[in-house]
Regions:
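Extracytoplasmic ligand-binding site segments that recognize negatively charged/polar headgroups
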Residues: 55-63, 84-86, 101-243
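Short, well-ordered beta-strand elements
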Residues: 47-57, 76-81
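A bilobed periplasmic-binding-protein/Venus flytrap-type ligand-binding module shared by bacterial periplasmic
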Residues: 155-160, 201-205, 276-288, 306-307
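A ligand-binding cleft/hinge motif common to bilobed small-molecule-binding domains
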Residues: 111-115, 240, 244-263
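N-terminal secretory signal peptides and thylakoid transit peptides that target proteins
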Residues: 2-18
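Periplasmic-binding protein-like
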Residues: 150, 180-188, 217-221, 228-229, 259-285, 298-321
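Bacterial lipoprotein signal-peptidase II cleavage site
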Residues: 24-34
Length: 359
């Protein structure tokens, strides 16, 4: 894995330090979109046949994304298994390693793809279109490529926040430890969702990798948590329906839901974490040409623009502007998130968290 850069060096390597300063952007601390290059590559062999795609993207993205790929790649049919819990898809791919059932894994934090790559369950592939992706947002071992950034925030049911917790938005993660939140919070399961784990890792990095302090935080946070839903979209829905007051969750998914329900709101505390959403080809694919063509298309400007339009995610490409009002890596204050360390210590931290909170 590549060595972790400090936040300013990382932004500089991605080409956005100057832009951030010029725009008066907020915190530092993350990778940013890469300089875009030319059009989508042409496959050596014409893709055809059928592929199966395991998707951790949400419903608002999946169907239109697949339809757009099929329109751009005549002759390829796509069977889609949508399951907005990347951890469950990772487990499924591992269980099927002797006889793979899917060709492509799309969505979810890169740590899920990274784990599969280390287990030898992903094909080595660097798409020609990956030249538009900065090296900090793709696997140096060529197992996966990032195509979007997700920023972690908090979804709130505005009516219940006003009535039950005083109406003020949380400005720090520590605000969620106040006893007034007891029984009112939920969090996507850290075991099955990338967001849940990134929430834990964010606390570790907030405390400069002092795991004792981070686990003390998670224990106190757990005291205010009513449940841990299996998917991040499910947690947003429960807050949107008014069943719970708030949930740490993905900013882009919160903004997408807010279009349907203006009664929710987004807060982004200082020192937040982020994900690099990835795409990869599964080892043993029966249709490698079409599977690689899918990855090629996902990395195009066209796909990046569609992803932003459908989901409010931030594209890794600099030639794809963010959605209006969507937070970006330079408009929020990010924690110094050591992605390599988080991936390498994921299993251990999850076990430590389970021991700490008694789950």
């Amino acid at each position: 894995m590549t060595p972790q850069l400090d936040r300013r060096s990382f932004l500089k390597a991605m080409g956005i330090v100057t832009a951030a300063a010029a725009c008066g952007g907020g915190g530092a601390g993350a990778p940013a979109p890469a300089t875009a290059t030319g059009a989508a590559p042409t496959a050596a062999a014409k893709p055809s046949g059928r592929i199966s795609v395991y998707s951790a993207l949400n419903e608002s993205t999946n169907n239109q994304f697949v339809a757009a790929f099929k329109a751009a790649t005549p002759g390829v049919e796509v069977d889609l298994l949508p399951l907005a819990a990347a951890g469950e898809l990772q487990t499924r791919i591992k269980a099927e390693k002797a006889s793979p059932k899917a060709d492509v894994f799309i969505g979810g934090d890169s740590s899920f793809h990274d784990g599969l790559g280390k287990d030898g369950l992903l094909e080595t592939y660097e798409s020609p279109a990956a030249s538009a992706v900065a090296k900090e947002s793709k696997d140096p071992n060529r197992n996966w490529t990032g195509f979007y950034f997700g920023i972690f925030g908090i979804v709130m049911n505005t009516d219940r926040v006003n009535k039950e917790v005083g109406g003020a938005k949380p400005t720090s993660w520590d605000d969620l430890l106040d006893p007034k939140w007891k029984g009112k919070l939920i969090l996507g399961s850290p075991i099955t969702t990338g967001g849940g784990y990134i929430f834990i890792a964010t606390q570790v990095f907030r405390f400069n990798k002092d795991e004792a302090k981070a686990m003390d935080y998670m224990k106190r946070f757990h005291a205010n948590v009513a449940q841990y839903p299996g998917t991040s979209p499910q947690a947003i829905q429960l807050v949107s329906q008014g069943q719970f007051v708030a949930a740490p969750n993905w900013a882009h998914d919160i903004l997408t839901e807010k279009v349907k329900n203006p009664g929710i709101d987004l807060a982004i505390p200082k020192g937040t974490g982020y994900e690099i959403g990835a795409v990869s080809v599964i080892k043993g694919t029966k249709n490698p040409v079409a599977a690689k063509a899918f990855v090629d298309w996902v990395l195009t400007k066209e796909a990046g623009e569609l992803n932003v339009k459908l989901s409010n995610r931030v594209s890794v490409r600099t030639d794809v502007p963010p959605a209006p009002g969507a937070p970006t890596l330079t408009s929020v204050e990010l924690v110094n998130y050591d992605r390599d360390w988080a991936a390498a210590n994921k299993d251990r931290l999850l076990k430590l968290w389970q021991q700490t909170v008694g789950i």
